[in-house]
From Swiss-Prot:
Keywords: Secreted, Toxin. Its main location: secreted. One of its GO terms (molecular function) is toxin activity. It is found in: Secreted. It comes from the Eukaryota. Expressed by the venom gland. This is Toxin To33. One of its GO terms (cellular component) is extracellular region. It comes from Tityus obscurus (Amazonian scorpion).
Length: 10
């Protein structure tokens, strides 16, 4: 998990 901005829906 790296810099995930908006889509944490992955």
């Amino acid at each position: 998990i790296l810099n995930r901005c908006c889509n944490d829906d992955n």
